[in-house]
């Protein structure tokens, strides 16, 4: 009986430990070097959990002030901040003609797509995250051009 109780406590501890481990992804460098990281399973899961860091910056999805006050370019990434210096958007370019819309859609199918449409020079797909969203922009040939996390 005592062994069963220890097993149960051990399973509960393991369960609690698994719940606290949130997926994360940290990208440092030029995002235009190789756009395939946008297809990485860990990147997709980290997006869902609002836990992606690009060049040392991560969107603060908890802030209520989403108004952009300043912007900072780091490598080929644009970081938008509110008046308090909290990151509200991160936009990064990707390598041209590398990731097709179909490839992106397949890699991100575990996340909820909330919008899809056309732009003047291509198309876009917007996905919901736990507390925010991200939008992928595609050129007229259907290749990923940039991603905006907010």
PLM regions: where:
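A cross-family detector of function-defining hotspots
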Residues: 14-150
């Amino acid at each position: 009986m005592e062994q069963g109780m220890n097993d149960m406590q051990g399973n509960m501890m393991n369960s609690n430990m698994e719940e606290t481990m949130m997926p994360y992804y940290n990208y440092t460098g030029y995002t235009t070097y190789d756009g395939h990281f946008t297809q990485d399973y860990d990147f997709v899961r980290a997006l869902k959990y609002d836990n992606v860091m690009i060049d040392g910056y991560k969107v603060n999805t908890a802030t209520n002030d989403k108004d952009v006050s300043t912007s900072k370019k780091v490598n080929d990434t644009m970081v938008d901040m509110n008046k308090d210096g909290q990151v509200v958007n991160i936009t990064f370019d990707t390598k041209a003609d590398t990731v097709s819309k179909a490839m992106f859609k397949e890699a991100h199918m575990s996340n909820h797509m909330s919008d899809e449409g056309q732009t003047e020079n291509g198309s876009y797909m917007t996905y919901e995250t736990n507390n925010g969203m991200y939008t992928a922009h595609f050129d007229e040939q259907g290749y990923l051009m940039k991603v905006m996390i907010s």
